Structure formats: structure tokens, C-alpha cells
């Protein structure tokens, strides 16, 4: 889908993988985690931008290119056909990440004069039992979580989709969000 070989390979775990790798069955919680981009899902920033583009265009996708001039793709793909109401709810939820009073990137609201839909994220570098040994104030800078955000806009007719990863940025809303909306 992009002129980089490895960008076509997305690791999406499934029950048989988990059983072989961890000797545990698949739990409903694994599905919930996958739905919000957590758990065992592995993707690159370019793949995240592709997901944002697909959501912005309500399931429609054209190939990406790193070429200097925009090349119109002849290959258009349409993913899972959600209802218009489903797409509205998805877009509304992502807009509320910034525009909502409890959104994880609500502090970005004042930084712009347009509406953006977003999903913030964090890639943990210290996990499980090791994480409990550290407080964020004592954690070495190189071990702080990576900050992520995917976004598209301006709403309601998005023209741009982005993904931003800030190494050791700690929080998607405060670490990666300002980069995405600038």
C-alpha cells in the first residue's frame, strides 16, 4: 500500500497466536484492547496514518506514496461497510478527544481555529511489575513512554490525516498532540 516493503505487513494477533506464544486463550478483554489500539497489536506510524485516512474517508482508501508529486492511485479499496450512523459516531467520538471537556487532548482546543478528530495513545517502554518500581518523576528519560496521536481534519470534511510519534513524549495528548495540530 506504500512504496516501502515493510509497510504492507501489519501484525494483528489472533487467538491461535496467543495460545502458541503465551499458552493462554483469547479473552474478551483482548478484543477490547485491540479495539482501542492496545494489547498485542503492532503497527508503524505510516500504518497508523493509513488507519486515520481510512477513518476520515469512511472506509475508503487509496494507495499511499512517498513520491514528491502526488500520484493518483488506480486502486481504491473499501473496507468494512459501516452505516452512516456508525461513521458519525466514530467521527464524533474522535472529535471529542480534543473538543470534549474530558478528552485526552482537550488542551489542544485553544491552539487552533479548526476542528480535528483524533485518537491519542501511549506506547509503554516499562511494563508490568517493572513499571510499579518507578514513578514518572524518577524514571530515566530514555525509559519514559512514547506519545502517539492519529488525527484527521479539518472536520466535517477532512482533507488531511496524520500520525505522530514522539519518543519518550509520555502522553499522546500533551506529547504528540501539539505536533499533529501545528
Across the structure, where does each feature detected by a protein language model lie?
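Beta-lactam-recognizing serine transpeptidase/beta-lactamase-like catalytic domain environment
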Residues: 1-164
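Periplasmic/cell-envelope proteins involved in peptidoglycan metabolism and beta-lactam response
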Residues: 112, 167-182
Amino acid at each position: 500500500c506504500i512504496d516501502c516493503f515493510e509497510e504492507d505487513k501489519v501484525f494483528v494477533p489472533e487467538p491461535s497466536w496467543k495460545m502458541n506464544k503465551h499458552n493462554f486463550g483469547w479473552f474478551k478483554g483482548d478484543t477490547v484492547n485491540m479495539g482501542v489500539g492496545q494489547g498485542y497489536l503492532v503497527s508503524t506510524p505510516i500504518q497508523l496514518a493509513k488507519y486515520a485516512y481510512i477513518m476520515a474517508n469512511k472506509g475508503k482508501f487509496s494507495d499511499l506514496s512517498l513520491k514528491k508529486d502526488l500520484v493518483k492511485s488506480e486502486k481504491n479499496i473499501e473496507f468494512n461497510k459501516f452505516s452512516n450512523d456508525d461513521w458519525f459516531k466514530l467521527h464524533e467520538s474522535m472529535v471529542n478527544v480534543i473538543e470534549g471537556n474530558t478528552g485526552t487532548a482537550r488542551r489542544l482546543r485553544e491552539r487552533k481555529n479548526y476542528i480535528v478528530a483524533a485518537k491519542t495513545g501511549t506506547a509503554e517502554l516499562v511494563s508490568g511489575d517493572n513499571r510499579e518500581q518507578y514513578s514518572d518523576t524518577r524514571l530515566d528519560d530514555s525509559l519514559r513512554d512514547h506519545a502517539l496521536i492519529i488525527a484527521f481534519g479539518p472536520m466535517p470534511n477532512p482533507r488531511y490525516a496524520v500520525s505522530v510519534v514522539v519518543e519518550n513524549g509520555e502522553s499522546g495528548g500533551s506529547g504528540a498532540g501539539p505536533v499533529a495540530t501545528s
